[in-house]
Amino acid sequence: YGIRQVDKESTVIAVSMSGNVARTVEAVKEAQERGAYVVGITNSLTGRLYEVCSHPVFLGLEEEPGWTPGTLTYTGTLYALYCLGAGLSRESERDGCLRKLAFTMEQVSRIVTQCQDMARQAGENFVYNGHQFPVYILGAGQNFATAKYGAAKFLEVCGVIAIGQESEEFAHQEFWVIDKNCPVFLVAPKGDSFQRTMEVGECLRHFGCDLFVISNSEELCGMGKYAFRMPEEVEELYAPLLYAVPMQLTAYYFSRKLGLDPDRRSHNDPFRKKVSRMLTRGTVNLD
């Protein structure tokens, strides 16, 4: 529907790691026909997005590391988007944005190491504490998208239902069906979205839920059964680059505990993979 508002004054950014997601490629073609400036972010030189997009950006990322699909490409995509944002910012602010971005990226490997033991414990907790599902992941502002991404990791590699929701909306919707044995992740850097997410967390702890807290607030971390402490210096704006890591790792260890292969998603099911291609790449062949 948004394509109707695109014209020659518009800038459109398309993202597809394979470069072959049919709807993304269609949107790029339509936007370019309407005269828009289109940037395509992809990790494939042979995909259709790189071929049809007037301004492709190739990430050039190597093969994924051996834990949880879509971790390296997700971080790489976010980094590219932040770089684009910095490039579009006021010249007086650009250098400061790029310095903060570089500092945050330098923290990624440290956070991966720092979160390993806690993520392993959290993943095992799902099994030994008899948790019910779905897994709920709550965030607000920029970190609503982080919550949605975290839910995707549990869906893809653990085969359990997971729901990423905006913190306020959760209070009006999913809360009415949540079981106190459902695990809840709170993605909550200090900033504009923090206070409401913390209030929701306090209520859920009172309700009896186990909280898995990802935050740079000691007060909120103190409320969690499991707490992933994030760097104080990283601002809310840049938090998505780091705050996805604990969920990636927890999903990885939970998947292994279930006896699954976290490196494979559900692609080891040939029929499911076939239908997935029908859904996303326009290959509708029912034979």
What function would you assign to each model-found segment?
Residues 1-104, 140, 176, 181-183, ...:
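Glycine-rich phosphate-binding loops that contact phosphosugars or nucleotide phosphates
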Residues 77-87, 241-252:
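A conserved, hydrophobic alpha-helical segment in the catalytic core
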Residues 90, 160, 190, 206, ...:
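Short, well-ordered loop/turn and helix-capping segments at boundaries between secondary-structure elements
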Residues 222-248, 254-255:
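Structured C-terminal subdomain patch of bacterial secreted/periplasmic proteins
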